[in-house]
Amino acid sequence: VHLTADEKAAVTALWGKVDVEDVGGEALGRLLVVYPWTQRFFDSFGDLSTPAAVMGNAKVKAHGKKVLNAFSEGMAHLDNLKGTFAKLSELHCDKLHVDPENFRLLGNVLVCVLAHHFGKEFTPQVQAAYQKVVAGVATALAHKYH
């Protein structure tokens, strides 16, 4: 991902304030509610029948935290996202058969959740930098599909 020094500083500073459990659970939950076809990858998670069920689901929250912990690894290695996400790309491609478009959708949902959590602190400049990061992560996760 090609970030300016200011962009890198902005995303890193904000990421240091992120509660991965809270934001991760909300981001994955919103993905499953807003794009319900993504639920097919989580049929072992139990009740996903209503938005309230999804947002209150302990397995969704736990997996959302796991997703954001992996994203944190990417934030620590912004210059090597393909390497950082190589094993996860392989897992999602070869074993889980996840549509790589879902990575882009989740990235966009994550940006919405960050805006919701950080309000005025999530300026248009910070959003632009995060859009670059989530696009880079989505590309890295889709790498094994090509």
UniProtKB/Swiss-Prot annotation:
Upper lineage: Eukaryota, Metazoa, Chordata, Craniata, Vertebrata
Tissues expressing the protein: Red blood cells.
Record Pfam families: Globin
Protein name (record): Hemoglobin subunit beta
Record-listed Phosphoserine modification sites: S44
UniProt binding sites for heme b: H63, H92
Signal peptide start and end residues: none
Record bears the keyword Heme: yes
